[in-house]
Curated annotation (Swiss-Prot):
Protein name: Osteoclast-stimulating factor 1
Main location: cytoplasm
CC terms in the record's Gene Ontology section: cytoplasm
InterPro entries xref list: Ankyrin_rpt, Ankyrin_rpt-contain_sf, SH3-like_dom_sf, SH3_domain
Top-level taxon of the source organism: Eukaryota
Role according to the record: Induces bone resorption, acting probably through a signaling cascade which results in the secretion of factor(s) enhancing osteoclast formation and activity.
Pfam families attached to this UniProt entry: Ank_2, SH3_1
Membrane spanning stretches: none
Subcellular location: Cytoplasm
């Protein structure tokens, strides 16, 4: 039996940096990047040379260069989702940045996409097999709470169609329905809850 291929780095353990200066490689296996480029570091096992990807090219980068000449981007997927930056979001996912990572407030990238009304971003996140729909942040809010509060009925509808839970309460004991700021969102959530209670035997 042949040996199984080595396991790839776990998604979410990829470190992301923005280069502050251009790096000119001295050997063919080193990675060229320019000031402002986003670098995805996938392997930091060698203390001197880290493996990274930039603009679809992979190569080695001196670790001390990254430490001194690049700034760390802690939650790149969240930043992309917040800004509605679709190409950066896709690049993060292509480079194995974890889709369910949490920022300091306990929010997922999906939460920020729903909060900002970025339907195209939500669409792309929905293509990720292990996406966590019902993650609650430190305030107990889910992506559904955010979409309802911001009044994005189209996104509320998308989340419900994917199976987002309507029975989760935040720290203030509020359901997404209680947070709905317009009739369209409230109506969708009410309809879903009524359908849900008819099926449960609590």
């Amino acid at each position: 039996m042949s040996k199984p291929p080595p396991k790839p780095a776990k998604p979410g353990q990829v470190k992301v940096f923005r280069a502050l200066y251009t790096f000119e490689p001295r050997t063919p296996d080193e990675l060229y990047f320019e000031e402002g480029d986003i670098i995805y570091i996938s392997d930091m096992s060698d203390t001197n040379w880290w493996k990274g990807t930039c603009k679809g090219r992979t190569g080695l980068i001196p670790s001390n260069y990254v430490a001194e000449q690049a700034e760390s981007i802690d939650n790149p997927l969240h930043e992309a989702a917040k800004r509605g930056n679709l190409s950066w979001l896709r690049e993060c996912l292509d480079n194995q940045v974890g889709v369910n990572g949490l920022d300091k407030a306990g929010n997922t990238a999906l939460y920020w996409a729903c909060h900002g009304g970025h339907k195209d971003i939500v669409d792309v996140l929905f293509t990720q097999a292990n996406l966590e729909l019902n993650q609650q942040n430190k305030l107990g809010d889910t992506a559904l709470h955010a979409a309802a509060w911001k009044g994005y009925a189209d996104i509320v509808e998308m989340l419900l169609a994917k199976g987002a839970r309507t029975d989760l309460k935040n720290n203030e004991k509020k359901l997404a329905l209680d947070m709905a700021t317009n009739a369209a969102c409230a109506s969708l959530l009410k309809k879903k809850q009524t359908a849900g209670t008819a099926r449960t035997f609590k």
